[in-house]
Design a protein with these regions (language model features):
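Soluble N-terminal domains of membrane-associated systems
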Residues: 1-102
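Cytosolic regulatory modules rich in charged/polar residues
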Residues: 35, 106-120, 172-173, 198-203
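C-terminal ends of transmembrane helices
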Residues: 110-114, 157-168, 213-228
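Generic detector of multi-pass transmembrane helix bundles and their immediately adjacent loops
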Residues: 191-263
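Alpha-helical transmembrane segments and their cytosolic membrane-interface
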Residues: 79-146, 235-244
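N-terminal charge/polar-biased segments
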Residues: 1-16, 117, 244-263
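Core alpha-helical transmembrane segments of integral membrane proteins
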Residues: 119-198
Length: 263
């Protein structure tokens, strides 16, 4: 059975549909933009001669049909992480499918490999959080001692987020508690080092800010995907609110019990 047959039979069409849906799901759950997911799926459908293919993508779901709606499929994508390596691998796969005579069997094998690309090791994420917090503290006008306090907070916060991910804790709780942890560590560390804590707190909190969600929301708006853009913007606002709640709670309690306003 030739997967590049201009007129694939029903069994092959269903296989092609399953492959395209799996590719779209891989893109969406790893941080790709909605318009890019739709575009990539349409390219794959044309390349494999899946006629009358229509797809509608939201931030947490994919709806697609082929033929005269004789084949239709819906996939829920509740989990959204960020792994641009997987996104790049699937995009490259779609280009090769369009430009070469890659068979469906080979494409399915390549997609499995793309979905198995591992996340960075835990120690890389810990060091990245520490370095990011250190640099942001300096960027926002902090001293070297403030940056060192921020680095400690960034290291601990990255470790805490990894634990939350392993135990599958709710995202809102993780963000609130992590922001509270960062604020507390920065206050205590800066008090020991004799330096103001504000720059340390701001620099450390930057590793929690929803930059990707906010940027993706704007891009979705620009491409006319208003519903997906609204969902992403709400997601970004909820994360920002969680950070504010966690930080404000610790600052308020510290001032209440010590009578000292954090500067």
């Amino acid at each position: 059975m030739n997967s590049r047959d201009p007129f694939p039979d029903e069994e092959l069409r269903r296989r092609i549909m399953d492959f395209i849906m799996a590719a779209g799901q891989t893109l969406l759950e790893n941080g790709a933009e909605v318009f890019r997911v739709e575009q990539t799926m349409e390219i794959m459908a044309r390349s494999f001669h899946l006629r009358e293919f229509h797809v509608y993508v939201l931030t947490n779901g994919i709806f697609a049909s082929a033929g005269t709606a004789e084949i239709s499929e819906v996939r829920n994508v509740p989990v959204r992480t960020t792994h641009l390596g997987r996104v790049a691998a699937v995009n490259e796969l779609s280009r090769q499918i369009a430009q070469t005579g890659m068979t469906l069997d080979e494409a399915e094998s390549r997609l499995v490999l793309a979905r198995r690309i591992p996340f960075p090791k835990d120690w890389v994420q810990l060091v990245s959080g520490m370095c990011g917090a250190f640099c942001f503290a300096l960027i926002f006008g902090g001293t070297l001692r403030s940056a060192l306090a921020a680095a400690l907070a960034g290291f601990l916060a990255s470790g805490y987020l990894l634990l939350c991910e392993q135990h599958e804790l709710p995202g809102g709780f993780c963000k609130i508690s992590c922001a509270a942890l960062i604020t507390l560590v920065c206050i205590l560390a800066c008090r020991m080092l004799g330096t103001p804590a504000s720059h340390s707190i701001i620099g450390s909190l930057m590793i929690l800010t929803p930059g990707i969600a906010f940027t993706m929301g704007i891009r979705d708006f620009v491409h006319g995907d208003y519903l997906s853009g609204t969902i992403r913007m709400i997601d970004a606002l909820l994360i920002a609110a969680s950070i504010a709640i966690g930080t404000g709670l610790v600052l308020s309690l510290y001032t209440f019990f010590t009578g000292v306003v954090v500067a």
